[in-house]
C-alpha cells in the first residue's frame, strides 16, 4: 500500500514515521514535484494542483484539518484537481473537539463574569464591582451543529448554561433547544446573549456574521468566532459595537491571517484577538484517525469524515 504526504508546514518525517508505526505494511513518502508514481491514499493540506490532478488509483484523500474550504476553492479555480469519485475526508475531531470546548467555555465564562469590563476598568485604575449577569438571561447560542458544534453545546450545558443551537437541517442535542433552516434563524438569534460561530465555510455561510444578524441578537450581546474568518464582515462588527448590538467579541479566525499589524482589531478595547489557536491539529490523534479510516476502507467499511463536495463540508 502506497501513501503520499504533503503539508507546507508540518514535519513530514514525524508524520511518515508515525503512520508507519500504525500501519507497518505501508510505504509512505513525502510528495515532491514530479512524483507521479502510484499511490493508494494521499494525506494533504493545500496541495499543489499537480499532486492530485490526473492521478489514477487513489482510494481516498485525507485533509489534515477540519476545514476543507481551501482545497475546494483550489478545485473551483482549477477544475480537475480532485480525481472524480475519490472520497475526500476531513478530520472531524482528532482532538480538536476538546480544544474547542475549552476555548468556548473559557470565553463564555470570561463574559459571564464580566472579565472584559474589569480589564477595561483596570486600565482606568477604577475600582468598581459590577452586577453579575443572571444565568437565565445569559443564553448561549451555537451556530452550527456539526461534530464540533455539538460537543461545544453539550459542554456548555454541563457547565449549567442555557444553550440553543442552529443548523441548516434538523439536529437533536440533549438539553439543547434546536433551531434549523432560514425560517428559524431569527428566533434563534433573538434569544441568544452569546453567539458562538462554528459553521462550516461555504458560499452560503460566508459573510453571515454581519450587521443585520448582530441587530437580531439580544441587546448588548457577545460574539465568539472560532470557525472561519470569512464568516465575519469585519467592518460590520465594528459598527455593531459602536451601535451597542455587540459589547464584546472574541475572534480566533480572520479574513487575512496573520492579522495585519495595523488592523483595528488589535487595539479595540472590546475585541479579544487570538492567533487561530482555538483548535489545532494534534498529530498523534490525527494519525490514529486516518489509520483507522484506512483500515475501514481496506475492509470495505464506511470511513468517517467524508465530505459532501456539493455542500462544502
Curated annotation (Swiss-Prot):
PANTHER family attached to this UniProt entry: 2-HACID_DH_C DOMAIN-CONTAINING PROTEIN, D-ISOMER SPECIFIC 2-HYDROXYACID DEHYDROGENASE NAD-BINDING DOMAIN-CONTAINING PROTEIN
Entry keyword set: Cytoplasm, NAD, NADP, Oxidoreductase
This protein's name: Glyoxylate/hydroxypyruvate reductase A
Classification via CDD domains: GDH_like_2
Main location: cytoplasm
Family listed: Belongs to the D-isomer specific 2-hydroxyacid dehydrogenase family. GhrA subfamily.
Cross-referenced Gene3D superfamilies: NAD(P)-binding Rossmann-like Domain
Entry's localization field: Cytoplasm
Enzyme Commission code: 1.1.1.79, 1.1.1.81
Pfam families noted in UniProt: 2-Hacid_dh_C
UniProt function note: Catalyzes the NADPH-dependent reduction of glyoxylate and hydroxypyruvate into glycolate and glycerate, respectively.
InterPro entries (alphabetical): D-isomer_DH_CS (IPR029753), D-isomer_DH_NAD-bd (IPR006140), GhrA_Enterobacterales (IPR023514), NAD(P)-bd_dom_sf (IPR036291)
Keyword S-adenosyl-L-methionine attributed: no
Catalyzed reaction equations: glycolate + NADP(+) = glyoxylate + NADPH + H(+); (R)-glycerate + NAD(+) = 3-hydroxypyruvate + NADH + H(+); (R)-glycerate + NADP(+) = 3-hydroxypyruvate + NADPH + H(+)
GO molecular function, one term: hydroxypyruvate reductase (NADH) activity
Active site: 228, 276
Record lineage: Bacteria, Pseudomonadati, Pseudomonadota, Gammaproteobacteria, Enterobacterales
A GO cellular-component term linked to this record: cytoplasm
Amino acid at each position: 500500500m502506497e501513501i503520499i504526504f504533503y503539508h507546507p508546514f508540518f514535519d513530514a518525517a514525524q508524520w511518515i514515521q508515525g503512520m508507519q508505526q500504525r500501519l507497518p505494511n505501508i510505504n509512505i513518502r513525502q510528495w515532491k514535484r514530479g512524483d507521479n508514481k502510484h499511490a493508494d491514499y494521499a494525506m494533504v493540506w493545500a496541495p499543489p494542483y499537480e499532486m492530485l490532478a490526473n492521478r489514477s488509483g487513489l482510494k481516498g484523500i485525507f485533509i489534515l484539518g477540519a476545514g476543507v474550504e481551501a482545497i475546494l476553492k483550489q478545485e473551483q479555480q482549477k477544475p480537475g484537481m480532485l480525481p472524480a469519485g475519490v472520497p475526500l475526508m476531513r478530520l472531524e475531531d482528532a482532538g480538536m473537539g476538546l480544544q474547542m470546548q475549552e476555548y468556548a467555555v473559557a470565553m463564555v465564562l470570561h463574559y459571564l463574569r464580566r472579565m472584559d469590563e474589569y480589564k477595561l476598568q483596570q486600565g482606568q485604575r477604577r475600582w468598581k464591582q459590577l452586577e453579575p449577569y443572571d444565568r437565565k438571561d445569559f443564553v448561549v447560542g451555537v451556530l452550527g451543529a456539526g461534530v464540533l458544534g455539538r460537543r461545544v453545546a453539550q459542554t456548555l450545558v454541563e457547565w449549567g448554561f442555557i444553550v440553543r443551537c442552529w443548523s441548516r437541517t434538523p439536529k437533536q442535542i440533549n438539553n439543547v433547544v434546536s433551531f434549523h433552516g432560514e425560517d428559524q434563524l431569527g428566533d434563534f438569534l433573538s434569544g441568544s446573549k452569546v453567539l458562538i460561530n462554528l459553521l462550516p465555510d461555504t458560499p452560503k455561510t460566508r459573510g453571515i456574521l454581519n450587521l443585520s444578524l448582530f441587530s437580531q441578537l439580544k441587546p448588548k450581546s457577545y460574539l465568539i468566532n472560532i470557525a472561519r474568518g470569512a464568516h465575519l464582515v469585519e467592518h460590520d462588527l465594528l459598527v455593531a459595537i459602536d451601535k451597542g448590538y455587540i459589547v464584546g467579541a472574541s475572534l480566533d479566525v480572520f479574513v487575512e491571517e496573520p492579522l495585519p499589524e495595523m488592523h483595528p482589531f488589535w487595539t479595540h478595547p472590546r475585541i479579544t484577538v487570538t492567533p487561530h489557536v482555538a483548535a489545532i491539529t494534534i498529530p498523534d490523534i490525527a494519525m490514529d484517525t486516518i489509520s483507522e479510516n484506512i483500515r475501514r476502507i481496506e475492509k470495505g467499511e464506511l470511513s468517517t469524515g467524508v465530505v459532501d463536495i456539493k455542500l462544502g463540508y
